[in-house]
Amino acid sequence: MRIAVMAFCLLAGPLSGPLTAQAVPCGGRFADFVDGLRAEALAQGQPADVVEAFFRTVRQDDAVLRADRQQGIFQRDFIDFSRRLISQDRLDRARDRAERLDATFDRIEQLYGVQRGVLLAFWAFETDFGTFQGDFNTANALVTLAHDCRRPGLFRPEVFAAMTLFARGDFDPARTTGAWAGEIGQVQMLPADILDAGVDGDGDGHVNLQDSAEDALTSGANLLHRLGWQAGQPWLQEIVVPAGLDWALTGLDKTRPVAEWAALGVTARDGALGNDGLAASVLLPMGRSGPAFLAYPNFRIYFEWNQSLTYVTTAAYFANRITGAPVYAAGDPDPGLNGDQMRRLQQRLAALGHDVGQIDGILGARTRAAVQTEQARLGLPADAWPTRRLLDAL
């Protein structure tokens, strides 16, 4: 779930804040690092028996580091990715679970204002409705990633959050398993998020996101609510854009009221646009000739769950499909660039002075922004979709 994706996209960097006197820097001998974590936990006030029991079975997991560095799924474009993740079978199962858990979803919508389709989509994508929640030992994963010097400031606090869950009986360092980045349960939440937003949805006295769908869904809704989800508001809507639209106006970094988009010729493909005064952005995940959406403020909350534009667009679209929206119009988009071509484009953009982040062949927000700027400079349609034509022009 949310910080999970930071594991995919944050760059290596210094810790976000000063370490305590007991903290040990990342790297070095793993055993020495764990000793430092023990000392820090004791300094934080954790009982000695809890600290000893938590770290007793912790081991470094090289498979976690390999998984952290191999995330090719995020190189897929929206059409490819969405067709891989969304099938009629998955859609049918989502609707079946919506019916079976109708009372739970009614309660969630009343308490937190998060629509059932949103949660069902995350539940489907994260663990296939709880079927596969990951088989990495969570304590090992978190300590391994905290020891790794790419993002220690992200994962170190999660170690202590997991320890707190252990102390209250909601985590087992020897048996709790999940994703490689430390997420737990049917909607894949990190320990700190469980501490902050975990809810006992089934009333058994524990927050058990692995075995209780009610706990998992209610906790996920509470987290989205705390992140700013607006009850009763849309998140993503398929639209039809006029051929003469100024493509430089598109992109998530540019918003204007729905009424202004309507005045520019933007229409809903199904139903009506959102309220006239609602801020929105035109999202073209594969350029002006591909699918088109209007992204509302709630869509931005998705990026707190996962920072891949392809993933969140697919999840938001699937949420709409679950509740009756039609299949999107794929259009006829330019095929774009392969990984090697994307890396060449990023290198060229960087040479021109653009900050594209890591040269990794992945189309991220900074690369899209640089592409749109160069398209406008060269007199090309500035839809932020990188093409061979742009690469050749550069």
Where are these regions (language model features)?
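A general alpha-helix detector
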Residues: 33-40, 104, 141, 345-348, ...
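Bacterial N-terminal signal peptides
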Residues: 4-17
